[in-house]
Amino acid sequence: MGISACDQRVAESTPPAPAPKAVEQPVAESASPTPPPAQAAEVAVTYRRPPFSWDTVPIYQMFGDGKRLLTDAELSIVAASSDFICLEKTHGLKKMRCTKLAAKREIERFKKIDPKMFCLFYFNSAYAFSFSKDTQVFGAEVVEEPFRSFLLSDPKTGEPKLRGIARMYDVLNPKFRTWWAATVGKGVRATGADGVFVDQMHGNVFSRRKQQKEVDAAQAEMMRMAKKAIGPEKILLLNGADSPELFEIGDAFMFEHPSARFITKEAIVKEWDDMKKIAAAGKISVWRIGVNKEPKAAKLVSEADLEKFSRERLSYYLAAFLIGAQPYSYFQYGWGWTLQDGALVEYPEFSKPLGAPKAEATRPDPAAWIFTREFEKASVRVDLAAGQGEIHWH
């Protein structure tokens, strides 16, 4: 996830997680676009899934405030907006001195409001953020063994290699993989979470392209170990899935859209197909949009301006989500990853009655990028070429 030591915004110096490979290789402009998929049938699974309903737009929330915990009022706002959440990596760090303790406290508070709230613990698979008692060793000026061997080294200096502010894990070290998976399992149990969100699934492969196959295999093995460590009823939400092997291991997948190139019209159509595949396997998808990645938003500074822009663009992105939404597809929306980046904004559209889709989406003109879909209580139209969407609530 593209998201300082104590303040979450500093971590935006780290690169974003890759989206699924199919998105990174969008269909050429001249190619015949893929038609939107039919709604997938629900299949039985062994793990617990978050509550899902078509009554209103299914919403996923993910946020953090590195300085503090939520106020009671903020807790109520978030709980009213979604029953599927994740606490971001620095949430509550300054207050609790350990993000694992902060996550435990917040999850307890959410579940007092609604025991069915589905809450995830955050852990990074590529960067050694020293925000919890389990990882604080990586923040030391000198990292002692065996933890030093868990980090990549700069070939010129021999010092731990950095990407932005973060030291980088060495996924090819089997002892690291064992430690990482065990730490994830311990974190899920200690916090009372319903699963884990795993960020940065690339394994720092950009540092050793010639070993991509080995890195991919090691990453997949580590996720398999993590799945075993958290237990069969807990979910493994992966930020991207770069291989069929990862798809088989993960229970849920995020489409992060870390930059504008991931939300082209071709990419969105391909993601609709991916969402169908995910649902057909009984898995979960999170379609996340940060409007701050749009070129126009780059000129906006204040939270008020960004909120206004997010409201202006909501009809398009929500329509695009609904065209491809399947059972257990969730929408995340805002302009960043902190608590102040949209998690507390109340969008009226999210509370309007939606109802289940009546049928698959249609494409009136095969040469155009306009798609429509009927829900029980809403009619949806999106023009991907124009970047415009309409939702008529019945």
Q: Could you describe each region identified by the protein language model?
A:
Residues P36, A40-H394:
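Glycan-processing catalytic domains of CAZymes
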